[in-house]
Regions:
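Membrane-interface helix-loop junctions and terminal tails of multi-pass membrane proteins
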Residues: 1-270
Length: 270
């Protein structure tokens, strides 16, 4: 098996199980309808764990462009492999979402809520505020990539890495996932969003492309910063990349804060 195929299959499994649990919870007349956020968070952790076990021996199971780019940025992964990895991840995510569509085929007809149908495939903010939504994705993915690196470096985790990473995903989902639904992975959102756009889902509405840049840019920035932060703080490699990404993250935080203050003032004056 090639690394490209391993990333494709691993990401496909991740999306089948992750998007699948959201479908079960959101779609009408599903046996899991209304089961809630805790189930979704746990299932996404298991989805990542099983995807990682599927691909780990071949490709180290990145399954996420934010991970691939973060590792490449600090020299832990060769840049010439990045296109194949990300291509495999995106294709796997699209295929996985299409499989979920067929798994729940009659339930699309039973579900009238367009936002629920889109929510099966793609993330969306609980409160739409692009600067704050971007920061949420940056922080979530920062924690993810930082966690992957310190888990990987810890001898106590040897042999259990995929399971512990799965628990990391559960923790991120429960603690940080509320504002945006925690994409923390560009292809986890983009692949299923493409599937939503092309599939003949009854009464589906639009695919909310105006929001789609948030779960792409946020995870990339957060993932790369998480890698530079680990390299700087844990390994002492404080270079230009760390300072540049630190400035970018600080600017994002300041922009989100002042945008929220502006909205608060507008609400108070209206």
């Amino acid at each position: 098996m090639t690394e490209f195929l391993a990333e494709l299959i691993g990401t496909m499994i991740l999306v089948i199980l992750g998007v699948g649990v959201v479908a079960g919870v959101e779609l009408k007349k599903s046996k899991a309808e209304g089961a809630g956020w805790v189930l979704v968070s746990i299932a996404w952790g298991l989805a990542v764990m099983l995807g990682a076990y599927a691909a780990g021996n071949v490709s180290d199971a990145h399954l996420n462009p934010a991970v691939t780019l973060g590792f490449a940025a600090i020299g832990d992964f060769p840049w010439n492999k990045v296109p194949a990895y990300i291509s495999g991840q995106l294709i796997g995510a699209i295929i996985g979402a299409i499989i979920v569509y067929f798994q729940y085929l009659p339930h699309w007809r039973e579900t009238e809520d367009k936002s629920a149908k889109l929510g099966v495939f793609a993330t969306g903010p609980a409160v739409r505020s692009y600067p704050a939504n971007l920061v949420s994705e940056i922080i979530g993915t920062f924690v993810l990539v930082l966690g992957l690196l310190f888990i990987g470096a810890n001898e106590l985790a040897e042999g259990l890495n995929p399971a512990i990473v799965g628990l990391l995903i559960v923790a991120i989902g429960m603690s940080l996932g509320g504002p945006t639904g925690y994409a923390i992975n560009p292809v986890r959102d983009l692949g299923p969003r493409i599937a939503h756009a092309i599939l003949p889902i009854i009464g589906k509405g639009d695919s909310d492309w105006s929001y789609a840049f948030i779960p792409i840019i946020g995870p990339v920035v957060g993932g790369v910063y998480g890698a530079f932060f680990y390299s700087a703080m844990f390994e002492g490699n404080i270079g230009a990349g760390f300072w540049i990404t630190s400035v970018i993250v600080i600017i994002a935080l300041i922009a989100a804060f002042f945008n929220e203050q502006k909205r608060v003032n507008q609400t108070a004056s209206s």
